[in-house]
Amino acid sequence: MKLILLGAPGAGKGTQAAFICQKYGIPQISTGDMLRAAVKAGTPLGQQAKAVMDAGQLVSDDLIINLVKERIAQADCANGFLFDGFPRTIPQADAMKAAGVKLDYVLEIDVPFDAIIERMSGRRSHPASGRTYHVKFNPPKVEGQDDVTGEPLVQREDDKEETVKKRLDVYSSQTRPLVDYYRAWAEKEAAAAPKYRAISGLGSVEDITQRALAALAE
């Protein structure tokens, strides 16, 4: 099972990726983890990536694609792999296609932006313990206070509404076009292209997992 998981920030990709990887016995590969592992291992590509990052520059798509090819050739990818957060852009998708990286599925977890904003901006946390709450879905017993200590809860910078909206804007302009890219490719070249599937990311975690696994069994 070789697949790409697409979806906006806050759509629940990380949670579903864990279930899918467990079901199929495949690793979850993110470019960040892949880069860190290559740098740590000191491979020639890892050394190139380190030099670029140390200079404060972005790693080129060519180098990323070469790292991807190196990563998916490893033994733990014998049964496949799940790409999380890659490709991010059309040029990266084109480069992956040109490099002959074969995929079985592209699975999109679709959640309306207003639901994502509500989901993320309602999160509150107790920094000392790591306990998390949600003002609507999992509220503390006393508003704004941790259930155990009574200490004030905080909203992380990443969860503030304006931050969430900015991240969704970036997703809309850079990554959302990939949905159309893979959908169009699947319609045009059904035999060569990965199967494109979209599922709703609304509802319970269990419901979404069932939808995801059913889509990957089609």
UniProtKB/Swiss-Prot annotation:
One of its GO terms (biological process) is AMP salvage. AMP binds at residues 31, 36, 57-59, 85-88, 92, 156, 167. It catalyses: AMP + ATP = 2 ADP. It is found in: Cytoplasm. Keywords: ATP-binding, Cytoplasm, Kinase, Nucleotide biosynthesis, Nucleotide-binding, Transferase. Catalyzes the reversible transfer of the terminal phosphate group between ATP and AMP. Plays an important role in cellular energy homeostasis and in adenine nucleotide metabolism. This is Adenylate kinase. The lineage of its organism: Bacteria, Pseudomonadati, Pseudomonadota, Betaproteobacteria, Burkholderiales.
